[in-house]
Amino acid sequence: KMRGSHENGDVFFQHREACNSVYNALPAVVEKYMAKINAKLGTNYDLFNYYGAPDADRVIVAMGSICDVADEVIDYLNAKGEKVGIVKVRLYRPWVSASLLKVLPKTAKKVAVLDRTKEPGSLGEPLYLDVAATLREAGLNDVVLTGGRYGLGSKDTPPSSIFALYKELEKDQPKERFTLGITD
């Protein structure tokens, strides 16, 4: 009888790393199918989509339903002369730093990353850490980066929380870590 792993430790690591080319090729495949969907439905899905002022100085990076809530707040604030926006993450893994940098306004001075998870004991949540690595590797060390959590357990995140976040980003030194919608 054969039991356990089908490969020994001497080759497992090598096989695991050999998968990298498949993951690295995936974004191009996803983009191809997004283009087909966009053509049929009239949408504009990409790996990352930006919404807001083209010269925004305060930008949120998030994924999921919070993006629709943020859109409404962005429309309101930009109509009043503010310069805010959001980067919507459409493909999270594999992470494509170049695609994020392509849509992030060059004028962004402060970026708040919203994660819908809590990673106890970590320096930050997954999306925050990916954005942080992207900015640092691109040499964008002057961009103030903050990270927060929202919506755990389906906790509602109303527009007032997004208003409060953009207000916080106006400060010279906004909170580095935060939560939206609860008192913590």
Where are these regions (language model features)?
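Conformationally flexible catalytic loops at phosphate/diphosphate-handling active centers
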Residues: 1-50
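An N-terminal assembly and electron-transfer interface module characteristic of large anaerobic redox
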Residues: 8-16, 91-99, 121-122
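A general structural motif
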Residues: 29-45, 62-69, 90-97
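Solvent-exposed alpha-helices and their adjacent loops that cap or buttress functional pockets
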Residues: 51-54, 103-105, 138-139, 172
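Redox- and metal-dependent alpha/beta enzyme cores, enriched for Fe-S-associated oxidoreductases
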Residues: 55-82, 95-102
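Residue-level recognition of beta-strand->loop/alpha-helix junctions
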Residues: 88-90, 149
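Peripheral docking tails and interdomain loops at the edges
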Residues: 110, 114-184
